[in-house]
Amino acid sequence: MNARMDCRQIVAPLDRGEARIPALVTLPNGRLLLFYDERPAPASGNGSDFNGLTMASDLPNPNRIRWVERTFSAEGDNASRWSTPRDLPLTLPAITSDACVGIDGDGLLHLACASTQGQVGYMDSRTDAEHLQAILAWGSGPEDLQVRDLADELYSRTGADALFATSGSTVTWQGAVLLPYVVRVGNRTHVQVVAVRGGEIQWLSDPLVGPQGVLLDETTLALWDGRLVANCRLQGFEGRGSGARYLAWGDGYSWNGGQLWDCEDPGCNAKQLADFFIHPHSLSSRSAGTVVRLSPPWEGNVHAEAVAALDGGEFGYSDLCVCGDEVVVVFERERGLWEAVVPRCELLP
């Protein structure tokens, strides 16, 4: 273990609600943006506590995606700041959740998110009845976005009863932003990559199905040694998805293989960057944020070496980006969003 990361809160929750589900992206002009869900207190239950009450069951609440920008107060000042929260354009639906963001080969920001016009959530969405919307917004920046609903095309092409793009930042491959969708057909789920560029679907990957009945859930994509790697959370609330993850690799269109990785993981969205992976390193709770370096899954059983750690406290959904000579990590803690910054030289080669 080489690096230790200090952290600070950057987005506080409103009243009894939550600020959660971070997604980081750097625009071609260097602007670093953080998108997140602003959520009211849930009608019942404990929100994002370790009980499964996440987007799957509470999306009909009036969630909305907001954004902040990382800035520096003065020239030569190395102390970063985050702006006050800002709204997305009114062209997007009033209810939005789970931002997945990336930049295409033409420099356009793409933001995929889930929405609903009624009371339907992920679990009761049906292809032939009321179902989740699959919103795609794109443009030069968050102030200027065109919007379309991909639901009709995606539900038709995948046969889904419900689908949503995994939150967080994603990769660009052959000029297209690759959006990792979780697709539910009946009570079975798989992962399918949707490639978009200029607001248009370029292709859909083959379905990625877990081994021996394992159901795959939210997925982080990475480019690693010329391969597209999918690092998948296993489906299951209240710890039933803990103890392992699934890593698959391919060319962006089809999958060449996969490995089930036994690891200390509670079942949580996480972020992979090449062979580095940041996640809550615990079987029983979303805590102990740790950066590990993985062995290539195509070489056999996956092994991990810890290279950096936080303080052992709460660590929920997270995202990571490289910003100049720094690595910026944003994660959920105490119903808000926190930031940790570590010199790039201490973490990445």
Where does each model-flagged region fall?
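Asp-box/BNR beta-propeller blade signature and adjacent active/binding-site loops
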Residues: 1-349
